[in-house]
Amino acid sequence: MSKSRRLFLSMQGDDDFWGNGDRLEEKKLPSIKQEKSKVMDDEDLEDRYYFKQNKLGRQQSESRHENEENKVSQEEKWNLRVPLEESILIKKEEPVPEMEESETIIASEEEQLLETSPSVDTNEEFYNNYRNYFQRRPEVIFLIRSMDENAVENYDKEFIDLYEKTRKSLEVCPNPELNQILRCECSSNTSTANSDNRLPNNHAVVVSNFREPDRRLGRYSKYYYHHNVGPEVYSRKVFVGGLPGCVKESDILNFFSRYGRLQVDWPSKHFGCKSDSDPSVCGDATSSFQQTSHLAMSSPPFGQINPFMSDHSTTSSETQNFGMNRNGNGGGVITHGMVRMMNAARNAGFGGGEPRSVGGESSEEKKQHHLGYVFLLFEKERSVRELVSDCFEEEEGLFITLESSIEPIRVQIRPWLLADAEFLMDFNVPINTKLVAFIGGVPRPLKAVELAHFFEQTYGNVVCVGIDIDNKFKYPRGSGRVAFSNYDAYVQAITDRYIVLDHEDIHKRVEIKPYFFHNQSCEECSSRYNRQYAPFFCPSLECFQYYCEPCWHKMHSHPSRFHHMPVVKGI
């Protein structure tokens, strides 16, 4: 693997960032072409040998048919040479003509059978051989499976690979007899099957690396599962949508706790954070007054390092916080007044009790009500796999029936596969770190292969696409990266700055900026033995390079470059 690809795949600073990503064995193009050519040559030899055998069989059957016709003609001539005396004697006798008529009828029937039977036998042998030959051919298997009503379930990886292999072999070494037979027999059936199974797509892109689409839209992308051949590994964070307002957090916990320990979270649940869908926003520093979680004091609130700790850690942390002075120095002694303050705070709703109000429902409970969707934070990845196995699949996605206290409710489950966080369009194209664009505002359900499909259609020359995921749950942050192989395509994307991402039911404007890499050296003053750290990057086409602080001021002191704005990490 080249240095640029390693840098691109490890830019998050987490070793397990890419999940089961780039694990395929790298092979060189000449070796792959040689193997393909050998396989195709073997297949061509088999086809030629088979057709030669068929020609020999036809010649033998024709020679037999000619010999039998000659025998029949000789017998007819011999019958015509019968003397006239025998014919006169036969006419005189009355019962004899009936017998002769029956004999002549039988003889004519036997002759007809002799004429037809060899041809029928030879044809049956020929067609039986042909059927046996074509039943094992992969292209005929493809046609049979495409005409089947349950063809959607048969689109697996082995089948698609087999189809691609045979299609390429037919394109490189065409066989006119085979193609003519396939067109004559299956043209009508394949047209009807394709009209039913393959719907038109307005966003189709003709790319050699895109495989046959997988029609299971619930779990996978509409493009075939592209690069990961290992086991499916899910994020421990699962989106649950379609929740009515009558469903409470306790109902959600009671239902989903059968799969394992979990927490329920949604944006604005904890007012100390902007959004809990991105754990990096919260950080490790939480507010001094945190609201209770659903585990009833068995785990601290969302955002801490280990959300599944015991109650002793929370109480000890609370006592330490109350034992600290304003300056941050520990007093070391917990007085009786401090204990009463702790109990009062807990009863007020900051520790473990529910907030009380005179009117029944308090304002804090209103703030903590979900917005029609929640996030399930499971302790183990196995729980997510069990949840996915219990869901039923439809065209819109995965669904499960939530058994609440009021009535059963159909809710949507949206898991995230770690392999969907990156997509390499071509393993043989090197990645230029200067041609990587940052994509902000990416919808979280969007997969890397779908983002690559969109940018390939819009700008072209896409090499690699990555979705930014958090380090804790491996869930999408809402941003991504696109690496281009062409400078013009990259410049066009950067100059557009904003573009509307229109993909199926997603319609959102995303932002495109140059991606800033850490630990880059100044390209103006750094040499082989003197590396100067470059915290600035100039995206203008006049500069388009990394600068250290002195070089930035030096190169942008000219009035023509005053308007250049630097790109800094985190801004």
Swiss-Prot record:
Residues 61-75 have a biased composition (Basic and acidic residues). The keyword Magnesium does not apply. SMART domains: RRM. GO terms for cellular component: cytoplasm; nucleus. The keyword RNA-binding applies. Keywords: RNA-binding. Cytoplasmic polyadenylation element binding protein that binds to and regulates the translation of specific mRNAs. This is Cytoplasmic polyadenylation element-binding protein 2. The lineage of its organism: Eukaryota, Metazoa, Ecdysozoa, Nematoda, Chromadorea.
